Amino acid sequence: MTINSKIELPNKPNQKFDVSKTFKIDSKLSVKGFKDKTEWVPEIDEGYIFDKETTLSILAGFDHNRRVMIQGFHGTGKSTHIEQVAARLNWPCVRINLDSHISRIDLLGKDAIKVRDGKQITEFQEGLLPWSIQNPVALVFDEYDAGRPDVMFVIQRILEVEGKLTLLDQNKVISPHASFRLFATTNTVGLGDVTGLYLSLIHI
């Protein structure tokens, strides 16, 4: 899989899924997803058991284009839950772990040297964030509260439903795809901790 390619799907979801049958929870709701599966759609775990309250919250994010954050202890399956919902809706899903090694450049992109017609040229190579925004992708930020401050400022721009991403180096403003969705998982709910692990939440 490569982020240089565009995901070939309809601009908007084109199939309805019965929540009760699809996720085996008590609900009379139906949600929209995609009819066809692409390479970016997670594999379905047939044995996965869905928590009703969490599932409905995630589905609200998909169906109504709402930003959803899931909080829980480490290793409780927060990101997996989002992935398994996306898998059943045939919704492409990308996870980015916001550990201390992820930088602003990693998200937005950088200049790269490429060979074209036998000559070396410098060309801007988009990162995962601009690519995701321009495609029907459910983007999941893992360990949201561990993100570096410079990274969090970049993410802040797209928290609004119609939030546009500005690439200053490229003089470019990117509008989100109609089926772009944003999720996050977190451990501390903004409280930080005494170990210094969650850099973006240390109170000064």
Where would I find each of the regions flagged by the language model?
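AAA+ P-loop NTPase catalytic core and its hallmark functional loops
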Residues: T2-L201
